[in-house]
């Protein structure tokens, strides 16, 4: 007796980057539920975090892993049944603020209802080293959604220490998968002076810069962060 090994193709959606940025900057909440839409049947199933749900039919959970120069996040979804003749699965998740994101798509599954389903989405989050950037806190800011203790993040903030400075402009803003923090200050003293500026995301100090200015000079701080998705 011989068996045919099932084959499939799968892809992870860029939506995960939009969610990670929205979550880390306090613009969206934690992952509350996941849903799988099966084709050609059109049936769907909703799953909840196994730590907060007693259902055994479907669920999801997170696993964090240490990887070189980063953090690995596994999002594991399971269902004990698959509708007959399923050839495509659209996997999505909904946040505590009611926003829905596409997570992954799976094609060419075996049309057999005796199969259970497990989908593991593995993400490796790394930071490109840069001066004045605190890598570990930055990783923590963008991966804490994958925790049973997930809580809605506080908005990003800028702060500074240094006497004799007047802040002319200070702002943090997010656009899609890009975050920017800007601060412009003037040294009001008639001698050189130093200011230290700190950027905080999701309660984590992600960048700190010490800037020396001449008498009556200006200090400029710009921190830009863009999430980039690469697949293997």
From Swiss-Prot:
One of its GO terms (cellular component) is host cell membrane. Keywords: Host membrane, Membrane, Transmembrane, Transmembrane helix. It is found in: Host membrane. It is a single-pass membrane protein. The chain crosses the membrane at residues 209-229. It comes from Sulfolobus islandicus filamentous virus (isolate Iceland/Hveragerdi). This is Uncharacterized protein 51.
């Amino acid at each position: 007796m011989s068996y045919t090994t099932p084959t499939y193709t799968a892809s992870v959606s860029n939506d995960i980057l939009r969610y990670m940025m929205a979550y880390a900057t306090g613009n969206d909440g934690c992952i509350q539920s996941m849903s799988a839409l099966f084709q050609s049947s059109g049936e769907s199933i909703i799953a909840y975090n196994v730590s907060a749900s007693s259902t055994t039919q479907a669920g999801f959970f997170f696993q964090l892993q240490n990887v070189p120069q980063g953090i690995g996040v596994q999002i594991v979804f399971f269902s004990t049944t698959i509708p007959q003749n399923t050839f495509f699965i659209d996997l999505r998740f909904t946040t505590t603020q009611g926003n829905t994101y596409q997570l992954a798509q799976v094609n060419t599954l075996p049309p057999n209802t005796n199969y259970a389903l497990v989908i593991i989405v593995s993400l490796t989050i790394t930071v490109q080293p840069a001066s004045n950037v605190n890598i570990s806190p930055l990783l923590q800011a963008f991966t804490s959604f994958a925790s049973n203790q997930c809580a809605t993040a506080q908005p990003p903030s800028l702060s500074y220490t240094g006497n004799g400075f007047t802040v002319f402009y200070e702002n943090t803003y997010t656009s899609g998968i890009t975050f920017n923090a800007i601060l412009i200050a003037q040294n009001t003293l008639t001698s050189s002076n130093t200011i230290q500026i700190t950027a905080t995301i999701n309660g984590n100090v992600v960048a700190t810069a010490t800037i020396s200015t001449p008498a009556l000079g200006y200090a400029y701080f710009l921190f830009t962060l863009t999430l980039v998705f690469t697949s293997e």
